[in-house]
Amino acid sequence: MSHSNNHSLRWAWYALAAVIVVLDQLSKYWVQMSFFEFERINLLPILDFTLVYNKGAAWSFLSEAGGWQRWLFTAISSAVSIVLVVWIHRLVAVQKLLLIALTLILAGAIGNLIDRVLLGKVVDFVLFYYDGHYFPAFNVADSAITVGAIFMLADVFWGPSEADLKADVNEQVKNKPEGDSNVR
């Protein structure tokens, strides 16, 4: 793959992350405009849409901590997002499962980061339950993070071999434009 193709593909991953962030934010906006807090609409026997706010992290961790957690989770999400952008930039093209994983996790982190910065809490609205047992409400960003984690695990088992990675890097070095020190 040529250097310019690899560069274009890298931006495609960032564009995909941006699309997921937009979908996440639009869905949260729709829920906030359509529901009162805690209002529920049944979609399926095991699925409702509802509007709940989470001031904490996953499963409402630290949600009652008094407000400081907003800044802690904002800092963590910001740092993770920066690391993921750099990581995606450094990956080689054959690492598709890992690229998908990191793109989804990046989108989810940014989606929830936007909520924390603008609202001080995260908007959740998808509620699964069965026989009186409820899974914590979640959103599109949370789903992206979860699916990204699954892809990351898949990469561990089915990702490219060391030989494939070396071949891809060698191909990029061979096709690198003169004077370009960036090989990815």
Question: Residue spans of the language-model regions?
Answer:
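Alpha-helical transmembrane bundles and membrane-interface segments of multipass inner-membrane proteins
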Residues: 1-184
